[in-house]
């Protein structure tokens, strides 16, 4: 491969690395999901990871369905998503 081709390849790889979200490298994809209380009407205090603020926040979980970005404790949320 010519030096021009190698430079082009290096440039494309650098661009790809810059455009790849850092969050996908640091924690599971479900940490990017929004808080989802679910359709049930329970009042359970839970925590979810907020990817923009890069921290765990509290929310009210209804008790069913929702998504995987749902933790019983803030420590569990931090260990899973904010590490």
Swiss-Prot record:
SMART domains: KU (SM00131). Keywords: Disulfide bond, Protease inhibitor, Secreted, Serine protease inhibitor, Signal. Residues 31-81 form the BPTI/Kunitz inhibitor domain. Residues 1-24 form the signal peptide. This is Kunitz-type serine protease inhibitor scutellin-4. InterPro entries: Kunitz_BPTI, Kunitz_BPTI_sf, Prtase_inh_Kunz-CS, TFPI/VKTCI-like. GO terms for cellular component: extracellular space. Serine protease inhibitor. Expressed by the venom gland. It comes from the Eukaryota. Belongs to the venom Kunitz-type family. One of its GO terms (molecular function) is serine-type endopeptidase inhibitor activity. The record marks 41-42 as: Reactive bond for trypsin. It is found in: Secreted. The keyword Signal applies. Disulfide bonds join 31-81, 40-64, 56-77.
């Amino acid at each position: 491969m010519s030096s021009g081709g190698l430079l082009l390849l290096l440039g494309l790889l650098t661009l790809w690395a810059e455009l790849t979200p850092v969050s996908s490298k640091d924690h599971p994809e479900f940490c990017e999901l929004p808080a989802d209380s679910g359709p049930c009407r329970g009042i359970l205090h839970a925590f979810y990871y907020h990817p923009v603020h890069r921290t765990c926040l509290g929310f009210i979980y209804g008790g069913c369905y929702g998504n995987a970005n749902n933790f019983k404790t803030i420590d569990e949320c931090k260990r899973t998503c904010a590490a």
